[in-house]
């Protein structure tokens, strides 16, 4: 979505966490925690009132902080009829990871990943890259610009347009941060 090459996600069991608990680390730092129940479904209740009559464990959805309730699969149709979106534990974790990748994309773009993107772009737009790097900007400065765009939530998928804009305006850029 943002044009970043996502590094592999390593999954390890951690007996220090509660059953069903998970945490996400980025460069060794915890960036998120969550809790899932393998044989239950999460009924997302944006109004905070739709799940009142449903049996289950009240919780907060980990990605966006919405009111929710862990329910049994037999309660799914009641929850959906009440206006809830119902998802399984796998979807909860996948959504959480996808959002964390979006929020931290600028931290995931290292020099190696950026170089891979530039090499791929070079196969189709080599002239722009030749013109830009190193004559107008260093590779490091281009990476800083790409990270800044990602920090702002701007996709770098259309790298050609970004590189062309940098080549056109490199002389006016004083600080690529």
Name the predicted role of every residue range.
Residues 1-177:
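Membrane-embedded alpha-helical signal segments
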């Amino acid at each position: 979505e943002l044009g970043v090459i996502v590094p592999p996600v390593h999954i390890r069991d951690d007996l220090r966490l509660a059953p069903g608990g998970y945490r996400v680390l980025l460069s060794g730092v915890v960036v998120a925690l969550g809790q899932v129940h393998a044989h239950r479904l999460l009924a997302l209740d944006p109004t905070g009132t739709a799940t009142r009559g449903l049996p289950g464990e009240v919780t907060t959805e980990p990605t966006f902080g919405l009111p929710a309730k862990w329910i049994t699969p037999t309660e799914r149709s009641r929850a959906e009829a009440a206006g809830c979106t119902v998802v399984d534990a796998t979807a909860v974790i996948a959504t959480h990871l996808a959002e964390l990748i979006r929020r931290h994309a600028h931290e995931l773009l290292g020099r190696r990943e950026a170089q891979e993107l530039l090499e791929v772009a070079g196969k189709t737009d080599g002239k722009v890259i030749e013109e830009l790097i190193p004559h107008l900007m260093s590779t490091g400065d281009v990476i800083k610009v790409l990270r800044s765009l990602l920090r702002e939530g701007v996709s770098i998928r259309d790298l050609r347009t970004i590189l062309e804009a940098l080549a056109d305006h490199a002389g006016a850029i004083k600080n690529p941060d």
